[in-house]
Amino acid sequence: MHDSEIFKFKDMMMMSCTVQTLVLVPWFLVVFVLAGGEDSSETTAMFPAMFVFGDSLVDNGNNNHLNSLARSNYLPYGIDFAGNQPTGRFSNGKTIVDFIGELLGLPEIPAFMDTVDGGVDILHGVNYASAAGGILEETGRHLGERFSMGRQVENFEKTLMEISRSMRKESVKEYMAKSLVVVSLGNNDYINNYLKPRLFLSSSIYDPTSFADLLLSNFTTHLLELYGKGFRKFVIAGVGPLGCIPDQLAAQAALPGECVEAVNEMAELFNNRLVSLVDRLNSDNKTASEAIFVYGNTYGAAVDILTNPFNYGFEVTDRGCCGVGRNRGEITCLPLAVPCAFRDRHVFWDAFHPTQAFNLIIALRAFNGSKSDCYPINLSQLSRL
């Protein structure tokens, strides 16, 4: 990374650290992450591995291998990633879990679909996330192939078989118990299901409250399946403020400076249930004695950034850096489209996804933030348990 880029991000991060709730992270660590974490394989990782289950916010290439419209394996996606080439990540650069992995001292973990033919290191973790995937099986079906939460858990079982071949049974048990699980799902169940009444019946069958209950029930089932496989350290990311993304601003013709509150309220209904789930699992006689579940308040952190953008170095909060139409969110980033010039000043990269600059802030808050960012503890604290 060039010195000018480092100082630009340093100014942004120091401002956010002094003004907002982000706990100050040592500057050498921020430089290390921004530089790509090249030495992560030579450091002692805070977790032996990280396993990621999620959607396009954390997909690092799985959908490249699927017959899906939800793919980002073309420029300008990846324009700020190493090599300036697309990887299947839905951003101009790194995702939140890319940054989290570097903060934890882990090497870049592979997409599940890149591991199926063997020859890839899976012992530091695997990413199962799939763009358009949701908690519900039918979510995102209009976009083609994708891995739902249930399917991602099934894919993990294949990885576990491979891991079990290389370790003794007791070693596998210890490895699983110490590894980190990151789950980021639920966004598509709204934007690619409930909020598309012409394609899905869910909004005519369920009111927002009962739909949130349905999501939580299915989510809990799959989460406990992962617990049953032996995982003991979980971070569960909440749904973001979907009423503020360019796609919804354009679709609902939101007034300048406003979000679609009805959509945000739906997201909060689900998030409130996730917090209650975390509390319940952390107090349950069985799970609480063996495991810890953490809620990542991505909603609150995102609202903070959108409300106080200048404190974080952002200037544009209501339109994508790459996209077409109102709010640059009616049509998402197309192949070889020309993105905005100052990408680090934009919260949103395209109609649905944030920029690398936004992802870095969220990752830092998850890593070393207060209880308002990660509840009941942050990732740094979780690693010491």
Curated annotation (Swiss-Prot):
Subcellular locations according to the entry: Secreted
InterPro entries: GDSL, GDSL_esterase/lipase, SGNH_hydro_sf, SGNH_plant_lipase-like
Superkingdom to which the source organism belongs: Eukaryota
Enzyme class, UniProt record, top EC level: hydrolase
Keywords associated with the record: Glycoprotein, Hydrolase, Lipid degradation, Lipid metabolism, Secreted, Signal
Molecular function terms, GO-annotated: hydrolase activity, acting on ester bonds
Active-site residues annotated for this sequence: 56, 350, 353
Pfam families per UniProt: Lipase_GDSL
Glycosylation: residue positions: 218, 285, 368, 378
EC number: 3.1.1.-
Residues annotated as signal peptide: 1-35
GO BP, sorted A to Z: lipid catabolic process
GO cellular component, one term: extracellular region
Cited Gene3D superfamilies: SGNH hydrolase
The family this protein is said to belong to: Belongs to the 'GDSL' lipolytic enzyme family.
PANTHER family: GDSL-LIKE LIPASE/ACYLHYDROLASE-RELATED, GDSL-LIKE LIPASE_ACYLHYDROLASE
Name this protein carries in UniProt: GDSL esterase/lipase At5g08460
Species of provenance: Arabidopsis thaliana
